[in-house]
């Protein structure tokens, strides 16, 4: 059995208060799901990338499963996921196979590397996540506009969104890329990106951080 990661984004026209309350209310139900190894209920940032301002119309759900079968059972049969689908106006779903993951999220690395090879033309998903040191918050947020501009100008990025557990302190992003080569070009050749990465290490911004790279498979959920 290979681990399966699913990341879903739900956008709301109505039911926004319900969506906000699910950040806490969904946790007991998720804890009881057979085969679940890790999960996070996540808010999102306004606009694209990191943002000081929340997007109260969009929320995300990250789940990690011991197998594709347990993930499928949850997505097909869970009353919780059906309520998300019914109450939201639109959704984006990403089925993720881990290619690489290093660092920690809540004192653990939840993503196990898949043994399957990357297929030609597969899209790439990137999750970056960090808990910021309180003393470094102002420095970090001063650099956010430059970081957002760098990814906006990156060749091959198809979509990206800021996500997080707590505003200001626990921040993450998910980005979808056309190819692994274009991810590497951005990581190693972008002067803006390289400067920011260097500064994070030099200034010790993060109490905890994680970087994970995934192969992305199409995932379409239907609801009544």
Language model: regions and residue ranges:
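Short S/T/G/P-rich N-terminal loop/turn motif that feeds into the first structured element of a domain
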Residues: 1-59, 68-74, 87-172, 182-189, ...
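A common structural junction motif
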Residues: 79-85, 194-195
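Extended hydrophobic/aromatic segments used for targeting, binding, or gating
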Residues: 185-186, 191-208
């Amino acid at each position: 059995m290979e681990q399966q990661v699913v990341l879903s984004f739900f956008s709301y026209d109505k039911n926004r208060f319900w969506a906000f309350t699910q950040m806490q209310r969904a946790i007991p139900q998720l804890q009881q799901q057979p085969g679940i190894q890790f999960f996070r209920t996540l808010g999102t940032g306004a606009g694209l990338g990191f943002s000081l301002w929340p997007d109260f119309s969009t929320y995300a759900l990250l789940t990690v499963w011991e197998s594709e079968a347990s993930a499928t059972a949850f997505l097909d049969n869970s009353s919780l996921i059906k309520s998300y689908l019914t109450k939201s106006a639109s959704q984006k779903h990403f089925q993720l196979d881990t290619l690489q993951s290093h660092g920690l999220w809540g004192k653990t690395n939840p993503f196990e590397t898949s043994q399957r090879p990357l297929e030609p033309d597969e899209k790439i998903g990137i999750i970056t996540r960090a808990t910021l040191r309180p003393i470094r918050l102002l420095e970090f947020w001063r650099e956010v506009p430059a970081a957002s501009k760098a990814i906006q100008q990156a060749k091959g990025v198809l979509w990206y969104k800021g996500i997080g557990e707590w505003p200001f302190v626990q921040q993450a992003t998910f980005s979808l890329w056309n190819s692994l080569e274009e991810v590497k070009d951005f990581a190693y050749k972008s002067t803006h990106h390289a400067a920011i990465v260097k500064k994070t290490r030099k200034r010790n911004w993060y109490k905890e951080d994680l970087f994970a790279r995934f192969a992305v498979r199409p995932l379409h959920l239907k609801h009544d």
